[in-house]
A protein has these predicted regions:
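Cysteine-centered iron-sulfur cluster-binding motifs in ferredoxin-type domains/subunits
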Residues: 1, 166-186
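Short, charged alpha-helical interaction segments and adjacent helix-coil junctions
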Residues: 158-167
Length: 186
């Protein structure tokens, strides 16, 4: 959202598109398209792959960038995005990555608020630089935390994405936000 707000671009929610089966978009001549995704198990969430496979864009796209957010390494997510978009005839001009607090709670501890705040501050600085590059329509692979053959580690994703390892404790207020926002309705 930060990038789209800074560049005055429209935001389209992948989760909302999947819920409403809305995959047809038209772009103005030379319009910029950006696809942002979190990294799951060194790759893309199945929802992002599903969205791209169903995506139909009419019009002449001007500049295409991808942005992946990750906790440890971006793995092969940028490689996967490039591959999936290529199947749709969409060529990426720039790839970006930003380290954020890792939110896969079965493994990562988010209870250290100072560490989370520090990671977010660093992310904000990185995002500001990315915004400047997007405005200038910079080209290149700026994914600084990818790993060679990172997409090969993605194999265990199907097992890891199961919700059986997730639980709540007494601090849960029962607001239902996690269930409401879950893109796969878990």
């Amino acid at each position: 959202m930060q990038v789209a707000n800074a560049t005055s671009d429209r935001i389209i929610s992948i989760s909302e598109c999947l819920k409403t089966s809305n995959f047809d978009f038209s772009v103005k001549e030379g319009e910029t398209i950006g696809i942002a995704s979190p990294v799951y198990n060194f790759g893309l969430p199945v929802t992002v792959i599903d969205f791209i496979n169903k995506l139909n864009i009419s019009g002449n796209i001007g500049y295409v960038f991808t942005l992946v957010t990750f906790g440890g390494l971006s793995g092969g997510a940028s490689i996967m995005l490039k591959s999936e978009l290529k199947k749709k005839g969409i060529k990426i001009n720039a790839q970006y990555s930003v380290r954020m607090p890792d939110t896969w709670t079965p493994v990562y501890d988010l209870s250290d608020k100072n560490k989370v705040t520090e990671t977010n501050k660093k992310a904000d600085i990185k995002i500001s630089g990315i915004i400047n590059k997007i405005i200038k329509k910079s080209k290149g692979n700026f994914d600084s935390r990818r790993i060679p053959f990172g997409d090969k580690f993605y194999g265990g994703y199907e097992e890891m994405r199961k919700t059986s390892s997730l639980s709540v404790n007494d601090s849960c207020v029962g607001c239902g936000l996690c269930a409401k926002e879950c893109p796969v309705g878990a």
